[in-house]
Design a protein with these regions (language model features):
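A generic "binding-loop/recognition-motif" signal
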Residues: 20, 30-32, 49, 59, ...
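Short loop/turn segments that connect beta-strands within beta-propeller blades
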Residues: 18-22, 57-61, 107-111, 154-158, ...
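Beta-propeller folds
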Residues: 3-12, 19, 94-101, 108, ...
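Conserved beta-propeller blade repeats
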Residues: 1-6, 26-47, 53, 70-93, ...
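Predominantly a core beta-strand signature of beta-propeller blades
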Residues: 22-25, 61-65, 111-115, 163-166, ...
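Structural motif
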Residues: 9-15, 50-54, 96-104, 142-151, ...
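C-terminal closing repeat unit and adjoining cap/tail of repeat-based domains
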Residues: 153-155, 162-166, 446-489
């Protein structure tokens, strides 16, 4: 049996498992997305460092690069054509929120890449009994949490499609993951996977060095993300798609229901209170069928006392998503932070060429001077602004990266801190006193929330095997930590005959 990914305490790799003796043998480090050829002689996989697609013999020998991605593109899920003569893979690109996702193939002997289909809502695939490709596609909003099955036929020799895709199902309540057919082709099997993000709050005690059991704040069954806090730390601001698109809400810590702050047809993300406590700021983009219609938006302000929202300034780009999945759309750039004691009031972070650009802005007057630039891959970076507004911290989401950078917005060389063994840092946040940091370390074994003093070593505060945490929001008074875990449920399904629409 061939498996790839992390196993137990090991990191990414390719493994052979003996079904008889239950022994485990690693044949390749720093590799995943492995697929065995139909004749069992070769393995195609992704290198987790270079992101190239590689080939090797079934025993791990004679490894060689097969395909390198173009600049700013990523290649995913390589698999074999049924005849074993071509490699099929997903090609992904995201630029300022515009997602390009398609399937291509290449002959095992090399040559040009041949496109098969393109759809930004493509999610998973398998081969049919007669050699056709069966794949799942997410529905358009407001049904983006459902997917359905399609099929397409092609020439196995050239990889070129034959005819147009054909829809197979018209179901609701399903997201197809790992679809496939049994060996005899008589049963269709798949996982129905339902990810959902909610807002949780946990009390910090003992000077922030201990975390009490978290309590769920949002009780609906939609996607909810935490934003900022009120200045008195009694109210959370959040954004939720409970009405079909993301709107802004506020909810007291002791309340069961959220109150709308800003609603409407546009997408609205990441609310935060202004330093004077009079306005709620948030980012806004026009809504489109398959993601943002434009790659620019606005920072808006809504009066806390009530009334219409007003534009503060234009912003470029759109926070990235994971294959267009709104459940995982909390990170990315642009993003902003406001702090009570910040010299500039608020700071905007935007994606540059292999760097993050920080710019000051005023909630009433708009964009001001550029403050600093940090050289880092923005596609895998997270950041936060210190409570006094003079420093930023940047972390990297990578399974080998356990370093964070702290940089002064006044200039100078960034300070590097190691939080080893905690890697894959999905979120980072300053503690209210500015003397420590909170980090979310994500792995296949769940998420760990870690406290990192600026002058000491990391300490584990909380661990949850079934959660992926992509946001951390400490309250201004230092008594609470809000976060947004993605909790995924998965059930295996089997159908006696292949689905038809």
């Amino acid at each position: 049996m061939l498996v790839s990914g992390p196993v137990a305490q090991e990191k990414q790799g390719i493994w052979l498992i003996s079904v008889i003796g239950a022994t485990l043998k690693k044949i390749r480090d720093d590799a995943y997305d492995a697929s065995l050829s139909p004749d069992g002689s070769q393995i195609v996989f992704r290198d987790s460092i270079t992101r190239d697609i590689w080939l090797m013999n079934a025993d791990g020998g004679q490894a060689r690069s097969f395909l390198k991605p173009e600049e700013s593109y990523n290649l995913y899920s390589p698999t074999w054509f049924p005849n074993g003569k071509r490699i099929l893979y997903a090609k992904y690109h995201e630029n300022n929120g515009e997602v390009s996702l398609g399937l291509e193939s290449r002959d095992l002997k090399g040559g040009d890449m041949v496109p098969l289909l393109s759809n930004p809502r493509l999610t998973d695939l398998c081969w049919g009994q007669s050699g056709q490709l069966i794949y799942s596609v997410r529905e358009r909003p407001p049904n983006q949490y459902d997917s359905n099955l399609w099929e397409i036929r092609f020439d196995e020799g050239t990889g070129k499609p034959r005819g147009n895709p054909r829809r197979l199902t018209d179901w609701t309540g399903f997201i197809f993951v790992d679809p496939g057919l049994t060996a005899d082709g008589n049963r269709f099997v798949f996982l129905n996977v339902r990810p959902q993000s909610d807002v949780y709050v946990a009390a910090l005690t003992n000077g922030g060095s201990e975390l009490k059991a978290p309590q769920r704040v949002t009780l609906d069954e939609r996607t909810d993300w935490p934003g900022g806090w009120s200045l008195d730390s009694k109210t959370m601001f959040l954004y939720s798609d409970r009405n079909g698109n993301f709107d802004i809400y506020k909810q007291g810590l002791n309340e069961r229901n959220a109150e709308p702050v800003a609603t409407g047809s546009d997408e609205k993300w990441a609310p935060q209170i202004t330093p004077d406590g009079k306005w709620v700021l948030y980012m806004q983009w026009s809504k489109a069928i398959d993601g943002p219609a434009v790659n620019s938006g606005k920072i808006m302000r809504s009066p806390l006392a009530g009334g219409p929202s007003e534009a503060v300034m234009d912003i470029k780009g759109h926070p990235e998503t994971l294959f267009g999945d709104p459940t995982y759309s909390v990170g990315g750039f642009p993003s902003f932070r406001c702090r009570l004691h910040a010299p500039s009031g608020c700071v905007l972070a935007e994606k540059g060429d292999k760097q993050i650009v920080f710019t000051a802005f005023d909630p009433l007057q708009g964009r001001k001077a550029e403050l600093a630039k940090i050289s880092v891959d923005p596609d895998s970076a997270n950041w936060d602004l210190s409570p006094d507004g003079t420093r930023v911290v940047v972390s990297i989401f990578d399974y080998k990266a356990a370093d964070i950078q702290i940089a002064s917005l006044a200039g100078g060389t960034p300070q590097k801190l190691s939080v080893m063994p905690w890697t894959e840092l999905g979120a980072v946040a300053w503690a209210a006193d500015g003397k420590s940091l909170f980090l979310a370390s994500i792995s296949s074994r769940g998420t760990s929330i870690v406290r990192m003093p600026l002058t000491g070593g990391p300490k584990l505060l909380f661990k949850q095997p079934s959660w992926d945490i992509f946001s951390l929001m400490p309250s201004p008074d230092g008594r609470y930590l809000a976060f947004g875990p993605v909790i995924t449920t998965a059930n295996a399904w089997t159908i006696a005959s292949f689905p038809r629409k």
